Amino acid sequence: MASISYDGLLRGAAKDIQTLTEASLVHGYFNLELDCPEGKQLREDVLFLESFTKEIFDTPSPQKTIYDFKKLGRFRTTGFKPLGIEEGAKGKSDGFEMFMLPQNELLLPSHQDKLQSPSAVFSHRATLTRCMSNYDAASQLILRRITESLNLDNALLAAHNPSEPSVTNLGFLRYPPQPATSENCGHIAHTDVGTLTILAATQRGLQVINSETQDWTFVDPHPQNEFLLVQFGDCLKFLSGGRVVPSIHRVIPSDNPEEREGTKYTLAYFVRPNEEAVIKDDRGEEWVYGDYHCRKFGAFARPLKEGDRDRMPDRPVGEYDMINIRKFKGLADGVSAA
C-alpha cells in the first residue's frame, strides 16, 4: 500500500504529491506516515483515544440506552450503536458496537453547549477536543493537496469550511470475538458516505479492494501508530467531478486465529461535508449534503432482500458483491479505475 509522508504533504514535496494523486485516481486509499511534529501529536492522540475507547464502552447499559445514536439527531453522529442491529459481512448481522462523538459540539463555539454524551466524555472533554482539532488539521491538509494536485476548483474546500457546521464525527468501534459459529460478522462491504475516513485499528479485519488483483486484501494495522490509514469516500468522488476513486471496503474476522479470539478496537475519523453543502451524485442529481447523508445511512439500516443484490453503489453485499464492485469501479471489462 502506498505511504505518504505527513511532513511531505506539509512541505508540498513532489514525491508525496504524486503518490497522493495516484492514490486518488487509482487506489482510493493510502497510509499517512506520522513523521513530523504534527504527526507525532496525532500518534499521542491515538494512544489516548485507544484507552478512552475501553473506558467509554464500560458505560453501563442503561446509560448506553439513554445515549442511543438514533435518539440524538437526524445525522446519527453522536451516541452508541448497539451490536448486531445492521447487516454485516457474509450474510450475518454486523459484528461491532460503536460510540460516536460529533465534531460540531467539540470545535464550534456555537454548538459546544449542545453536546449530549456520558460523563466520561465530559471528564476528558479538553483532551478529546484537542484530538478532534488535530484530526481536522490533517484532513484539511489532505483536501487542500488533493485540490491542488488534481487542479480542482474550490468546491471541495468550500464544502468543508471548518467554521460551518458539518456532519464530521469521530467513531470508536469495538468488535467482540467472532468465531465461525457467531451470528455476527464484521461490517458489510460499502463505500463511506463522506469524504475521508482516517483509521487506526488494533488487529486485522479491514479489507479493501486491491487495484491490481481486483479482489479483497487485508490491511495490516500499525501497533505503534506510526501510520494511519486514509480512505476516500463518496463525497470526494462527487466533489472532484468523478475523478477520485472511493474505497470499497468491508470488515471480517482476522485471518489470524489468535486475533479472532480477542476483541478488536478501531478508531475512525469520518470527514464529511458541511451540513448545507451542495453535492452532485453519480446521476447528476444535486443534494444538500445533510439530506444525502441521511439517505445513505437509511440504506444501511434497511433489511436487505435477496432481490436487492445488485443495488450498487448504495450497498454492495458480502459474498455477492465482487461482480457489482467491478462494475461500479468500471473494471468489469478491464477498464482502468483512473
Swiss-Prot record:
2-oxoglutarate binds at K264. Fe cation binds at H190, D192, H249. Pathway: Antifungal biosynthesis. Due to their effectiveness as antifungal agents, echinocandin derivatives can be used for the treatment of human invasive candidiasis. It is an enzyme of class 1 (oxidoreductase). SUPFAM superfamilies: Clavaminate synthase-like (SSF51197). Its EC number is 1.14.-.-. Binds 1 Fe(2+) ion per subunit. Gene3D superfamilies: B-lactam Antibiotic, Isopenicillin N Synthase, Chain. The keyword Iron applies. Keywords: Iron, Metal-binding, Oxidoreductase. GO terms for molecular function: metal ion binding; oxidoreductase activity. Residues 165-273 form the Fe2OG dioxygenase domain. 2-oxoglutarate-dependent dioxygenase; part of the gene cluster that mediates the biosynthesis of echinocandin B, a fungal lipidated cyclic hexapeptide that acts as an antifungal agent. Linoleoyl-AMP, produced by the fatty-acyl-AMP ligase ecdI, is transferred to the initiation carrier domain (T0) of ecdA. The linoleoyl-S-phosphopantetheinyl-T0 is sequentially extended with L-ornithine, L-threonine, L-proline, L-homotyrosine, L-threonine, and 4R-methyl-L-proline to form the linear hexapeptide. Belongs to the iron/ascorbate-dependent oxidoreductase family. This is 2-oxoglutarate-dependent dioxygenase ecdG. It comes from Aspergillus rugulosus. The lineage of its organism: Eukaryota, Fungi, Dikarya, Ascomycota, Pezizomycotina.
